[in-house]
């Protein structure tokens, strides 16, 4: 075992206790302190809100115009029937939407096994009771729309459908196949370390997925969402090339900024030397030919230019700039 303070322990799936086909306890350890709650809460939220599944979204019952009514010969009112339909656990194979039908007559229970479907639909709990018929001549005829989705989608979000016929009842769709989930964090020990976590997740599903597959899918979803952060190291910020000015700003300043003596300044202006860029391109010989500009003035000019890291006789390409020509 490494003793590095910065090295994280990697957990392993210790045990899957299968209490029933749809109920299991999953134990993960060892985890660094605090990671039990971090992972437990993240997985719990994903399992409850982000797992794909199937749900009844629309129902049509012959003779029924709205959910706040009852049907003669049926023990339950329509609201109860809709609640029972919401608890249907089924799987659609190869497609995302299926329309099923149900017809039953005579006294007795109406169960999920009475639903008429093709081989692409699997009903996980065929014994699930939908309603009870109380008279010999009573009957019920339903069309049931099932859709694939994830999370919770309220019926009100689909109320805007304009071509929805009267009598088509919309149901809140809870797509999650997870019925109950909780987690607990206990103390764990590895060799001499006793400050570790053990994560125990207990869950029940509706039978459309087993608990082990559910936890693996939730972990995959979490991992895929975090990949974007892992890939941050591979993202290269585009290099922003700073546009360098074509000319040193100092060269664009007027010679008056050099604060030369009046004599030297007047001599330069007489030679149409208005900018520092004009001045530095002149040589010493050229300046000495300027009327009234002697060696003393030349020395002054050279000293002032040197304080700005400039010299006489410099070559400046594309001088003068367009901006100076326009101003002139």
From Swiss-Prot:
Question: Per its UniProt record, what Pfam families does this chain match?
Answer: RNA_pol_A_bac, RNA_pol_A_CTD, RNA_pol_L
What domain of life?
Answer: Bacteria
**Residue ranges of region Alpha C-terminal domain (alpha-CTD)?**
247-328
Q: Where is this region: Alpha N-terminal domain (alpha-NTD)?
A: 1-233
Looking at the keywords, is Transmembrane helix present? Answer: no
Cite the EC number.
Answer: 2.7.7.6
Reaction catalysis annotation = RNA(n) + a ribonucleoside 5'-triphosphate = RNA(n+1) + diphosphate
Q: Name one GO molecular function term.
A: protein dimerization activity
For the biological process aspect of GO, one term held by this record is: DNA-templated transcription
Keyword check for Transcription: yes
Gene Ontology CC terms: cytoplasm; DNA-directed RNA polymerase complex
Task: List keywords of the entry alphabetically.
Answer: DNA-directed RNA polymerase, Nucleotidyltransferase, Transcription, Transferase
Which SMART domains did the record assign?
RPOLD
- Anything noted about its domains? The N-terminal domain is essential for RNAP assembly and basal transcription, whereas the C-terminal domain is involved in interaction with transcriptional regulators and with upstream promoter elements.
Role this protein plays: DNA-dependent RNA polymerase catalyzes the transcription of DNA into RNA using the four ribonucleoside triphosphates as substrates.
Family indicated by similarity: Belongs to the RNA polymerase alpha chain family.
Listed under subunit, the entry gives: Homodimer. The RNAP catalytic core consists of 2 alpha, 1 beta, 1 beta' and 1 omega subunit. When a sigma factor is associated with the core the holoenzyme is formed, which can initiate transcription.
Could you tell me what this protein is called? DNA-directed RNA polymerase subunit alpha
Recorded source organism is Wigglesworthia glossinidia brevipalpis
> What is the primary gene name for this protein?
rpoA
